[in-house]
């Protein structure tokens, strides 16, 4: 008789191995049916389209989960170095389609849903965007997570689970109005709460120096509840984790004040603690020193570092070897990447844990911290740099303030020893800025406390070294690197532009999806008549589809054979949507002046959100909509020029407009845009770029040949020279009649007859204090736009340039970017190892 199984042996039956995957259409249908009835508790008589979406999401998620568990088991066994990407923003967009694409499930799901009498595309459109970011910085983090999973890195994204993401933008009477983005209202099928890993985060209190070391006492505690979202790599069975923290009040919150007798009041006040993760701050490239924001920054850092250290200590390696409780090996097992200065508190927090809690001596702790942390700089705009008042730290994080002072003192002692008597250098390099309000310069803290500092495009990294952190570069040049940004080709080609992806696959196979440099193989096809026709046909189909979408969603009818001239990004003076406006007004005036002349028809689309408190940006939106009101209703103009403001620009709208664009506008003042990634998305999707020599545009021109982009305007050196000389806007206004006419029309109320003074602030800024020198580039921009028109008249030559651009866009994959981070900053190698799927036994 067989020996009875032990409990431990019985438990081996609890395994992901025995669970069927989604091999075929029948299984998808079965799983969909099961989830509709058993998970959502609906039948077809009462199910809503959203129920069908959720049933499909749970079906796809089932397929993910086995791989997710397997991946974590694999990491536990191999114990690789872990990469922790810390960011206050992850702009993920929608998840369903991306998950199906990366798991290779799209065709099976499409067919199953079709067989059930439903439409997959209609279901996909119901899903909310996860809008936990403002723009480029948050979207970069999302692309990076995709690439890290695809490259088999043991990586984790850590951030905040904002209850309300970036606001929804409504346009009312031409003005932006913000609405709360209640993205979790119907639940989120992709996240898994992990209350068992809930962690305390401390605020306020006081510091006591005792013989046993330093104690941070009498703090207020907020709990951080983790929610995990799977991040699937592309067809490699790797599923990484994005862990977002949500704030919860502890059960005894304020109840220690019970003698006050107001139990109800105490429970209601739990909201105060939980407000920490309530809402994303909607500022892009602008620092607003609010205490709640500082709380958010410390909240994510404190929870994440506890989690990192828990994982470090409990790893398999640590069980076998006492070395793990000694932190010497910490930088060999942990890399922390700071996405801008927002998670800068990681540096003093790691020091606090090592010195105060783990009793590591200061110098050793500092060495560990520096080897572990690396910092990515994303902007050179002075108004965007984080400078927190010391008084706020004193109250909120008193121990961290002491640690920052100590870090700064040692740093300044070091600088003083190297540059004796150079007092001004000490002032410039201090973490503490003296003045009426003493401030902590978070960028300086990041540079001092990291072993690597990188910019996000070559030109930006040079500006970082020669200007923003010049003194620090002179001190430690080996620290500074460049890592040109990239985008994931899975979302930004395969998912959003399947027609173009298929056309490319027919010619060069599928390898380019994980090695975008393979697109170079398209270069010999640049004169291939059939390929030229195929590429042009895909673009026309995308334009027709987007035209239909505009008509349905925005009730706007456009001419699909016009040039789609697209300018979509956050609204900011440095991005110069105003330069685009001046071009549009000038074109309008030319049509009115000579209506019989042949014009290349254009549909100009401008989209993007303005920070709610940014008056000028909101006024720019009003100007765009007002110009549209005049131009679009002028019978003389007809179909030749249309101006559309794309309301509520977000990831899911980008996925529609980018594949349809002919012309991509990337026209920031040289030296202002760190990199840009929209520029890369348009390039990969077959739009031509009009742009300045700024950010990644420089490298795009280098890759594709400047003659295959429309480059214009001042370069960084010219901008600097103009600053030294003194920029005088009036000179341009007086000498360029078309510019003068356009500015006068805006100024006089031609576009705002009911409010003639509506745009006086814009004109005043342009004439008297325009930091971004719009007028200085106007003439060159107009000439460049004329070249665009000329080429567009020759569709074949236009498409040849498009093909060259697509073929040369390989550098701009986030896979390449992440490979560089891995090798040159984190000290890990990407892996093309396929983790066995759940139905295959492990080694």
Swiss-Prot record:
Superkingdom of this protein's organism: Eukaryota
Site (Involved in the association of subunits): 109, 143
Cofactor: pyridoxal 5'-phosphate
GO cellular component: cytoplasm
Protein's GO biological process: glycogen catabolic process
PTM annotation (N6-(pyridoxal phosphate)lysine): residues: 681
EC number(s) from the headed UniProt entry: 2.4.1.1
Post-translational changes noted in the entry: Phosphorylation of Ser-15 converts phosphorylase B (unphosphorylated) to phosphorylase A.
Span list, region Pyridoxal 5'-phosphate: 677-678
Biological function: Glycogen phosphorylase that regulates glycogen mobilization. Phosphorylase is an important allosteric enzyme in carbohydrate metabolism. Enzymes from different sources differ in their regulatory mechanisms and in their natural substrates. However, all known phosphorylases share catalytic and structural properties.
Name of the featured protein: Glycogen phosphorylase, brain form
The organism of origin for this protein: Pongo abelii
Taxonomy of the source species: Eukaryota, Metazoa, Chordata, Craniata, Vertebrata
Name of encoding gene: PYGB
């Amino acid at each position: 008789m067989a020996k009875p199984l032990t409990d431990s042996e019985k438990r081996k039956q609890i395994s992901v191995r025995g669970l069927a995957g989604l091999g075929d259409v029948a299984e998808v249908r079965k799983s969909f049916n099961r989830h509709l009835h058993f998970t959502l508790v609906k039948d077809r008589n009462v199910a809503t389209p959203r129920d069908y979406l959720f049933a499909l999401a749970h079906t796809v998620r089932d397929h993910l989960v086995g791989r997710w568990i397997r991946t974590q088991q694999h990491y536990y066994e191999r114990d690789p170095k872990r990469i922790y990407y810390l960011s206050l923003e992850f702009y993920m967009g929608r998840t369903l389609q991306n998950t199906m694409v990366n798991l290779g499930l799209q065709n099976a799901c499409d067919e199953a849903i079709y067989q059930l009498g439903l439409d997959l595309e209609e279901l996909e459109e119901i899903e909310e965007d996860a809008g936990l970011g403002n723009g480029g910085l948050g979207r970069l983090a999302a692309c990076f997570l995709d690439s890290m999973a695809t490259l088999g890195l043991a990586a984790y994204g850590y951030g905040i689970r904002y209850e309300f993401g970036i606001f929804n933008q409504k346009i009312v009477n031409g003005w932006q109005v913000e609405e709360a983005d209640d993205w979790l209202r119907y639940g989120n099928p992709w996240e898994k709460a992990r209350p068992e890993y809930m962690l305390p985060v401390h605020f306020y209190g006081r510091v006591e120096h005792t013989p046993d070391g330093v104690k941070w006492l009498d703090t207020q505690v907020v709990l951080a509840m983790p929610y995990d979202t799977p991040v699937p790599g592309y067809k490699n069975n790797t599923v990484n984790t994005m862990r977002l923290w949500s704030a919860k009040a502890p059960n005894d919150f304020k109840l220690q004040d019970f003698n006050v007798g107001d139990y109800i009041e105490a429970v209601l006040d739990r909201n105060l603690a939980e407000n920490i993760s309530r809402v994303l701050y909607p500022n892009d490239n602008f620092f607003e020193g609010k205490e709640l924001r500082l709380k958010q920054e410390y909240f994510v850092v404190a929870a994440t570092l506890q989690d990192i250290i828990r994982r470090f200590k409990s790893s398999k390696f640590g069980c076998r070897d006492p070395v793990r409780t000694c932190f010497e090996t910490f930088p060999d097992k942990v890399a922390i990447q700071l996405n801008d200065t927002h998670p800068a508190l990681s540096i003093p927090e790691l020091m606090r844990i090592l010195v105060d809690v783990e009793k590591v001596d200061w110098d050793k702790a500092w060495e560990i911290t520096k080897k572990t942390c690396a910092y990515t700089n994303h902007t050179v705009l002075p108004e965007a740099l984080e400078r927190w008042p010391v008084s706020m730290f004193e109250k909120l994080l008193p121990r961290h303030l002491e640690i920052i002072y100590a870090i700064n003192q040692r740093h300044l002692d070091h600088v003083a020893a190297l540059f004796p008597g150079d007092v001004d250098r000490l002032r410039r390099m201090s973490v503490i800025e003296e003045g009426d309000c003493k401030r902590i310069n978070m960028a300086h803290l990041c540079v001092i406390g990291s072993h690597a500092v990188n910019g996000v495009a070559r030109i930006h990294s040079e500006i970082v070294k020669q200007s923003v952190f010049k003194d620090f570069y002179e001190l430690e040049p080996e620290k500074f690197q460049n890592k040109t940004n990239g985008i994931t080709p899975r979302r930004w080609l395969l998912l959003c532009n399947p027609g173009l992806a298929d056309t490319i696959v027919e010619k060069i196979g599928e390898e380019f999806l994980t090695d975008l440099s393979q697109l170079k193989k398209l270069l010999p096809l640049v004169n291939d008549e059939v390929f030229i026709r195929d590429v042009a046909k895909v673009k026309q189909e995308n334009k027709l589809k987007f035209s239909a979408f505009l008509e349905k969603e925005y009730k706007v009818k456009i001419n699909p054979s016009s040039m789609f001239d697209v300018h979509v990004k956050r609204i900011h003076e440095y991005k110069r949507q105003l330069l685009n406006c001046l071009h549009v007004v000038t074109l309008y005036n030319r049509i009115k002046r000579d209506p019989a002349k042949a014009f290349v028809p254009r549909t100009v689309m401008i989209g993007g959100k303005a920070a709610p408190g940014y008056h000028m940006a909101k006024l720019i939106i009003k100007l765009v909509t007002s110009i549209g009101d005049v131009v679009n209703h002028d019978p003389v103009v007809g179909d030749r020029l249309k101006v559309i403001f794309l309301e509520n620009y977000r990831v899911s709208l980008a996925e529609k407009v980018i594949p349809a664009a002919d012309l991509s506008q990337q026209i920031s003042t040289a030296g202002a845009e760190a990199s840009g990634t929209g520029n890369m998305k348009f390039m990969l999707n077959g739009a031509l770029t009009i742009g300045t020599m700024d950010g990644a545009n420089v490298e795009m021109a280098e890759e594709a040949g400047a003659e295959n982009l429309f480059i214009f305007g001042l370069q960084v050196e010219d901008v600097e020279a103009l600053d030294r000389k003194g920029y005088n806007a009036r000179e341009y206004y007086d000498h360029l009649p078309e510019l003068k006419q356009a500015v006068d029309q805006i100024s006089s109320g031609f576009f705002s007859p009911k409010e003639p003074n509506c745009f006086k602030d814009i004109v005043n800024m342009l004439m008297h204090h325009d930091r971004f020198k719009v007028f200085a580039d106007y003439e060159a921009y107009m000439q460049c736009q004329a070249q665009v028109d000329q080429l567009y008249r020759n569709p074949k030559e236009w498409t040849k340039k498009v093909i060259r651009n697509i073929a040369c866009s390989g550098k701009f994959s986030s896979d390449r970017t992440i490979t560089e981070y891995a090798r040159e900053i984190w000290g890990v190698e990407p892996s093309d190892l396929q983790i066995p799927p759940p139905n295959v036994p492990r080694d």
